[in-house]
């Protein structure tokens, strides 16, 4: 809304470090929709996967012995920004925009983009632009990577009641208690689902029969007409919004294994 960014441009137009990476050929909108055509597969259980070997250590998860103790200069991939710029490559068989394929690297590119444009760490942007305007009962906190950079892909910690406040603001198209927090146009666009959006999800065989009709602007869309959508966390956390019924629900979970929106239990929750 401020004119600082155009979603039709590439992230590399704003972050030169991404030149030559998988994110050089995509638009910001494709990143927002998880349709960026990355060669990197997000696998949480295979210890030989790229996630275990490179992304998880950069995220400071410390899955690998000694990973959390690595010092700067001892690896080309130290923090998440290194991983995004130096490791993630494009999938030559999947053009950008063709297929929905959830990948956490997209979220971290967006976090980097926000931080670069606002010229301050992501946690300070969230604090100043969103959290301070919600009348939150408690402080939130955010995880950092191995380089002490706030990460966007996960690790945002808040109470259920404060998360519900955020959901109410999203339901009301960016307004909370009469104060404008986020642009209405942005929060209307997220449910402006087009045929190309539903086709992108249908092309992923894992989601072709799912309840979701599309994924747009980092939200899972259930019903565009009812403006019904969700934010879903890796271990079963959900913020559910239905503007037609004026509903917001939040539930937390502590599922030991990574949750899947395709799991049989998930539609039962909804």
Q: Residue spans of the language-model regions?
A:
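Active-site Gly/Thr loop motif
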Residues: 137-141, 188-248
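Active-site helix/loop module of the DD-peptidase/beta-lactamase fold
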Residues: 2-44, 89, 117-154, 158
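Structural recognition of the beta-strand scaffold that forms the well-ordered cores
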Residues: 30-33, 101, 139-142, 155-157, ...
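Flexible glycine/proline-enriched surface loops and loop-helix/loop-strand junctions
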Residues: 89-96, 106-108, 145-152, 225
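Carbohydrate-binding/catalytic loop surfaces
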Residues: 52-55, 144-158, 204-205, 209, ...
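Short, gly/Ser/Thr-rich active-site loops of penicillin-recognizing serine hydrolases
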Residues: 259-270
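Short, charged, amphipathic alpha-helices and their helix-cap/turn boundaries
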Residues: 5, 12-13, 47-96, 120-139
């Amino acid at each position: 809304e401020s004119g600082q960014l155009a979603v039709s441009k590439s992230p590399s137009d704003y972050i030169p470090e991404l030149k030559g990476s998988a994110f050089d050929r995509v638009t910001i909108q494709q990143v927002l929709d998880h349709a960026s055509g990355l060669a990197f597969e997000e696998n949480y259980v295979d210890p030989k996967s790229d996630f275990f070997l490179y992304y998880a250590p950069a995220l400071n998860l410390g899955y690998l012995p000694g990973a959390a103790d690595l010092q700067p200069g001892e690896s080309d991939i130290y923090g998440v920004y290194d991983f995004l710029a130096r490791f993630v490559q494009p999938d030559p068989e999947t053009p950008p925009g063709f297929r929905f394929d959830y990948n956490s690297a997209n979220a971290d590119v967006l976090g980097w983009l926000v931080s670069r444009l606002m010229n301050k760490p992501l946690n300070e942007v969230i604090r100043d632009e969103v959290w301070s305007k919600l009348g939150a009962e408690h402080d939130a906190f955010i995880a950092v990577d191995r380089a002490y950079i706030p990460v966007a892909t996960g690790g945002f910690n808040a109470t259920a009641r404060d998360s519900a406040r955020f959901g109410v603001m999203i339901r009301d198209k960016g307004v909370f208690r009469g104060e404008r927090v986020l642009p209405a146009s942005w929060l209307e666009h997220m449910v402006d689902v087009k045929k190309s959006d539903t086709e992108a999800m249908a092309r992923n065989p894992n989601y072709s029969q799912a309840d979701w009709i599309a994924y747009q602007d980092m939200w899972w869309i259930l019903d565009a007409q009812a403006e019904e959508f969700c934010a879903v966390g890796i271990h079963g956390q959900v913020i559910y919004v239905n503007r037609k019924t004026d509903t917001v629900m939040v539930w937390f979970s502590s599922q030991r294994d990574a949750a899947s929106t395709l799991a049989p239990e998930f539609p039962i929750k909804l």
